[in-house]
């Protein structure tokens, strides 16, 4: 496929970070220095507008300020940064700074694009929303000190204002016809009502106040607990109640009936923008759709071979029905499912030295998806650490166990834990020579492409020996291939939700529950699902090129090192770096 770089404007003279025009040709060293100054300015600004990094109890905004004035000012500043970035002669930067420029520019551009397309009108997807994002807020506080509790309480006290600002933008979306579709909102109110509790002490927001980790005296500790109960009962829970009422009586009834984002104002342009953002290529939706159909046909043929291998007498649909309904393929308790996932992860741990030179220092755990979001959540997901004293976590959805087949658990675990997301993200965080905006970056085409490639690596690590598990691997690969078809189908080509679900049902062994939740995810998050297969196919193609050109000089551990050593990068940057590695290796022979 043809790859595209984010647009760059080349000039012999550049703007300084203060936008003063330079009057002379700059040396490479001074250009790198000036670029670094600019990126430092961008990073400083990001910190200034991020309320979660604030530790001052007197700060006015400890949760995001989403007023129209503030969002407009932030967008203006980002456009300013883009002008400064585009004024730099990228060819004059060091090779590493050229990558830095590409990545930070894409990050800033994405924020500008989201604002331009009014993404803030829809602060929710079928899986989560601003109301559930607060569950993670607890991580950013030091509860070994009284000040940590006080800061947390101050943040909680701002929940009503934060909710009202989001609701105001949702009302703007209702006026503009830019809402989530009604189809994906059925039952969504349960994720809101989960926070509305009569017993304050059962609230997850009260959890930090169950243990006196700051070792305060009894009077101080009891005073903090009383304050927490007051903030929750008078501010937080009423905010959730107000949102619940707005959602059920105003928002959902007014939500659009059409599921495709292309039916919304400027929707086709928005989808094309999201497709480019999530794949980091210039592939059109039409080309992506066709690629998906080709991959579906290829994978289907491999699945048919396994059906023959196990001696099943019946059609593909009958075999899938057998997998979906036979009790032998399902755990009977959450503990059993978690233990199976943990065992698979531990088996893969032992194979990692054969595949990688460097392993991350940060450990990971296996845990259930939080109950408040589990009903509409995907099968599993990786939740990265936010602080140095935390582990990463591979979340396994234990809700509706009869919809969580064991035959896909090897593929799921390798994707979310190791060698997939945990290994890649944890290693990325340890690349100390990279600036923070790259260590903390997550480019979906790279990260999800690596996750899907990691499922494939299980073949080389001795997994999928059971034919049903291998069928599970293929159904997960088919799942990602089908995404290319149904995501573009719904958002660009007028497919109905039922047609998309039928395509998924007919071509994968995913449970019907998963088919529904996944289809709704694609509807509510346009374009993101395209990244997996595009990224995986790129990594596989680069590996094949390296194996062919290097012959007996090919080293799988070195290849993986080259894939991961630059962190999360756009696919065209990855291709440039792998080609450089191949050429350098050949030159040394």
Task: Label every model-predicted segment.
Residues 2-13:
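Bacterial N-terminal signal peptides that target proteins for export
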Residues 11-22:
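Bacterial N-terminal signal peptides
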């Amino acid at each position: 496929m043809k790859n595209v770089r984010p647009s760059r404007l080349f000039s012999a003279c550049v703007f300084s970070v203060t936008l003063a025009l330079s009057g002379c040709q700059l040396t490479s060293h001074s250009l790198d220095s000036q670029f670094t100054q600019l990126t430092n300015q961008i990073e400083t600004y990001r910190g200034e507008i991020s309320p979660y990094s604030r530790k001052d109890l007197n700060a006015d905004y400890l949760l995001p300020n989403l007023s129209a004035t503030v969002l407009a000012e932030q967008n203006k500043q980002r456009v300013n940064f883009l002008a400064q970035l585009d004024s730099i002669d990228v060819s004059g930067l060091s090779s590493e700074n050229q990558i830095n420029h590409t990545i930070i520019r894409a990050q800033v551009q994405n924020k500008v694009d989201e604002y331009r397309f009014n993404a803030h009108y829809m602060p929710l997807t079928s899986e989560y929303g601003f109301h559930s994002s607060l569950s993670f807020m607890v991580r950013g506080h030091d509860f070994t000190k009284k000040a940590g509790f006080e800061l947390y309480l101050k943040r909680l006290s701002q929940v009503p204002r934060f909710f009202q600002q989001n609701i105001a933008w949702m009302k703007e979306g209702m006026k503009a016809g830019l809402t989530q579709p009604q189809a994906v909102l059925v039952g969504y109110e349960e994720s809101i009502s989960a926070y509305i509790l009569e017993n304050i002490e059962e609230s997850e927001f009260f959890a930090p106040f169950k243990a006196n980790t700051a070792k305060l005296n009894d009077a101080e500790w009891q005073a903090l607990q009383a304050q927490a109960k007051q903030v929750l009962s008078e501010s937080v829970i009423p905010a959730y109640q107000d949102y619940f009422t707005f959602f059920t009586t105003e928002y959902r009834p007014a939500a659009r009936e059409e599921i495709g984002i292309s039916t919304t104002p400027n929707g086709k342009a928005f989808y094309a923008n999201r497709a480019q953002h999530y794949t980091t290529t210039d592939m059109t939706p039409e080309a992506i759709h066709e690629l998906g159909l080709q991959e579906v046909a290829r994978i289907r043929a491999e699945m048919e071979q396994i059906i023959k291998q196990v001696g099943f007498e019946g059609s593909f649909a009958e075999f899938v029905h057998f997998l979906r309904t036979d009790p032998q393929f399902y755990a009977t308790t959450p503990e059993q499912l978690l233990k199976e996932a943990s065992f698979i992860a531990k088996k893969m741990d032992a194979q990692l030295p054969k595949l990688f030179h460097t392993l991350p220092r940060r450990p990971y755990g296996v845990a259930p998806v939080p109950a408040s979001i589990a009903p509409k959540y995907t099968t599993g997901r990786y939740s990265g650490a936010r602080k140095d004293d935390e582990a990463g976590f591979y979340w396994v959805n234990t809700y509706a166990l009869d919809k969580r087949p064991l035959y896909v658990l090897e593929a799921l675990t390798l994707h979310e834990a190791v060698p997939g997301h945990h290994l890649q993200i944890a290693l990325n965080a340890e690349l100390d020579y990279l600036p923070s905006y790259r260590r903390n970056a997550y480019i979906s085409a790279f990260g999800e492409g690596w996750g899907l490639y990691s499922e494939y690596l299980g073949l080389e690590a001795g997994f999928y020996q059971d034919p049903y598990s291998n069928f599970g691997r293929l159904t997960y690969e088919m799942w990602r291939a089908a995404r290319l078809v149904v995501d573009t189908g719904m958002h660009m080509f007028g497919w109905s939700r039922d047609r998309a679900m039928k395509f998924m049902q007919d071509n994968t062994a995913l449970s019907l529950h998963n088919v529904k939740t996944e289809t709704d995810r694609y509807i509510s998050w346009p374009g993101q699902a395209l990244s997996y297969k595009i990224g995986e196919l790129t990594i596989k193609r680069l590996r094949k090129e390296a194996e062919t050109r290097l012959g007996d000089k090919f080293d799988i551990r070195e290849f993986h090192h080259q894939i991961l050593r630059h962190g999360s990068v756009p696919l065209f940057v990855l291709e440039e770096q792998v080609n450089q590695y191949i050429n350098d290796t050949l030159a040394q022979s």
